[in-house]
Amino acid sequence: KKSLALDFKSKEGFEILTKLIKKSDVVIDNFKPGFWDKVGLTNEWFNKNTKKIVRNSISGYGDVRPQGGLPGYDFLLQAESGLMKITGEKDGNPMKLGVAIVDIVTGMNAVISVLAALLLKRKVTDQSILTEVNLYNTGIFLLANVASNNLISGKEAKKYGNGHPNIVPYNLFKTKNGDIAISVGNDNQFKIFSNLIGFPNWAKNNRFKTNENRVINRIELEDLIQNALSTNDANYWYQVFLNERIPCAIVRSVSEALCHEQTLKNDMVKDIPHPKGKKFKSVNTPITINKKRGLDVPLSPPLLGEHSYEILTKRLSMSDKQFLAHCKNGVIRDGRYKK
């Protein structure tokens, strides 16, 4: 990611912007709907001047009323989409997720739409392609199986804490020294699980024999499991279940997760150079291509306008004299760090 700071409300800045667009393959924006039309860069302009371009616009709600055109915020969209109503303990207040999940997935959807459009561009060559994503649609999309259950059954979704509406046991349980997550996905797994914790008769009991009945008798069964697991520590049960391929995980803190051997072996923590000469640690990309992850020398989040000079002199062949004049007039900000 590189930063160009440009005042394109000015005549000179607008001219620079249009030149950059014409030399681009993809243009992504997060302006309010209608912004491009307002500044004169309509769909007709893009189709006439930039037939090779794929565009992507990210907004809060799209351009359809009643809320189209309003700004969007992750916290508010978690509330409006229903996500808060299905997050938290059964009798607790609506709760947001621990990360800005709507923001994050909207960005991922933007990337997916751009990649799909680039493939389509092989066939559609006579006009630019516009893709659009918004936070509201992403929030609704994230309801996933909860939305399906509601649409098919007509029943209002409930909060299950760490549980699952359709699978039991699927929850956190306390051990002697910490919490462990258990996800028993079918009746055969439950038979093995019951035997491992010392209660093989559970799998023969009609109240627990099938997942359907385990869901009905959820509270009773979870209490029994809790009593059994509290007799030993988390790592003990983790090894017992892991050896028999029962899905489970020890609940870690963020610090524990970032320092875990698997995280480090997967190269998920990276030293990033800072523009001011220092280094800081950050999470690496989760994607590998041909076993290679990310850049050899990853870029830090840029200073504002840090790459203005690089972009304009290389992409537009702007002279140093022109660049300095635009900086003096406030059209461009030169954010290069000067030691």
What residues fall within each predicted segment?
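A structured beta-alpha segment of the ubiquitous adenosine-cofactor-binding alpha/beta core
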Residues: 2-48, 230
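Active-site-adjacent "lid/gating" segments in soluble enzymes
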Residues: 23, 35-180, 184-185, 192
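Beta-strand segments within the central parallel beta-sheet cores of soluble alpha/beta enzyme folds
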Residues: 127-136, 240, 323-328
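Aromatic-enriched alpha-helical interface/lid elements that frame and gate functional surfaces
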Residues: 168-244, 248
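Conserved PLP cofactor-binding pocket of PLP-dependent enzymes
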Residues: 242-266, 271
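Flexible, small-/acidic-enriched active-site or ligand-binding loops
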Residues: 274-325
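Amphipathic terminal alpha-helices
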Residues: 321-339
